[in-house]
Amino acid sequence: MGEPGFFVTGDRAGGRSWCLRRVGMSAGWLLLEDGCEVTVGRGFGVTYQLVSKICPLMISRNHCVLKQNPEGQWTIMDNKSLNGVWLNRARLEPLSVYSIHQGDYIQLGVPLENKENAEYEYEVTEEDWETIYPCLSPKNDQVIEKNKELRTKRKFSLDELAGPGAEGPSNLKSKINKVSCESGQSVKSQGKGEVSSTPSENLDPKLTVLEPSKKTTGAPIYLGFPKVTEVHHEQTASNSSASQRGLQMFKVTMSRILRLKIQMQEKHEAVMNVKKQTQKGNSKKIVQMEQELLDLQSQLCAEQAQQQARVEQLEKTFQEEEQHLQDLEIAQGEEDLRQQLAQALQEHWALMEELNRSKKDFEAIIQAKNKELEQTKEEKEKVQAQKEEVLSHMNDVLENELQCIICSEYFIEAVTLNCAHSFCSYCINEWMKRKIECPICRKDIKSKTYSLVLDNCINKMVNNLSSEVKERRIVLIRERKVKRLF
């Protein structure tokens, strides 16, 4: 969760603040600072970065925005997220602002299969600062800053291995070279019969390296790094042990240099004292002491040269370890990317399978509907054919049985004679003006009977015929009515 201590400020401590309390958890709370816009998502430019461990794509890059309106009321807006923002179990419209109040329930994303609740569920609350800040989630910029500090700490040097106040390898190398030069100058001056004074300040700065912190070992090098494979752990452990051995050799050599320095200073003081006491006395003893001083200086130079070589070797080892750690970081990052890509591909294939299943279901439904449509069409065609057949048969019946033999039209006001033959009322009346006999059987006409049933039947059958036939019949009826009047 990170250390929330950086949230505590002088004016805020002891007050009350609004926050989104993570439901069922005492960590991962989101602080709503007055006057600040709070963005939530899985991208890098948001206030709080939420990366789902179960479904990385559940939270969008910039999922939602929380800010205060001019009245100071906190509001929430869905920033066109893929899986949506839910306020009190109701999904919010994208880019629409909604007010939130104490106790409101906020859900980011949707629950996965076989799960009742979503991964990120919050409750709007206002609590005391002392209650809130131990549970707060670190902001995205603070997480990035902390990661930068961790990467900086990994690039340790001799300065860190030697403890606080120690000097780096480059400074140590230059100062050892300086000591070597000063020692060589002292040897040259003594070869001329002069013993120059060597102040203790010339070598004191190098002595700070002799007090490395016991905590500075190879182990802390790997703090803050992600877990890698066992092979990486073994390689790291071997490199760490090599660094520890090199550090121990470095400390031992510096201790020798310190002892030689002290012996050389004591010998130098002894030579000076002897010279003062016996300026022209025992020159043999002075020469002997100067020779011993030269031997000590030569030994010191040799130790310093060895120390220089060890420093270079240690620097090389540290550089190799640093490069190795960087390679491990790159490999781990690539592995994480491969895992994310594999998971994304798996989700993609699952979605494609679901789409294929849906496609097959839709195709089956469409085929069934097409089959039903074809059957309906066939039935309709059959009904139409039957209807046409009935109409054709009806036309035949009308033409053969219900036509007047005089006018060759369908009966209009049908009249049946005593001989059982039927004619139009107008037609038989006109016929009887010339002859009083049946036009068909030539029997005398004794009676005429109007057939209303036959008229109604003919009218209903004509209604099912074409419009031309119906119009022609109407015209004939009108003409005959007019002729009757005259």
Curated annotation (Swiss-Prot):
Q: Which Gene Ontology cellular component terms are annotated?
A: chromosome, telomeric region; cytoplasm; cytosol; midbody; nucleus; site of double-strand break; ubiquitin ligase complex
Cite the domain annotation text. The FHA domain specifically recognizes and binds ATM-phosphorylated MDC1 and phosphorylated HERC2. This domain is also required for proper recruitment to DNA damage sites after UV irradiation, ionizing radiation, or treatment with an alkylating agent.
Q: Which GO terms of the molecular function aspect are on file? A: chromatin binding; histone binding; protein homodimerization activity; ubiquitin binding; ubiquitin protein ligase activity; zinc ion binding
Q: What is the lineage of its organism?
A: Eukaryota, Metazoa, Chordata, Craniata, Vertebrata
Q: Which GO terms describe its biological process?
A: cell division; DNA damage response; DNA repair-dependent chromatin remodeling; double-strand break repair; double-strand break repair via nonhomologous end joining; epigenetic regulation of gene expression; isotype switching; negative regulation of transcription elongation by RNA polymerase II
Which pathway features in its UniProt record? Protein modification; protein ubiquitination
Output the PANTHER family linked to this UniProt entry. E3 UBIQUITIN-PROTEIN LIGASE RNF8 (PTHR15067:SF4)
Keyword Kinase listed: no
Name of the protein in question: E3 ubiquitin-protein ligase RNF8
**Post-translational modifications:** Autoubiquitinated through 'Lys-48' and 'Lys-63' of ubiquitin. 'Lys-63' polyubiquitination is mediated by UBE2N. 'Lys-29'-type polyubiquitination is also observed, but it doesn't require its own functional RING-type zinc finger.
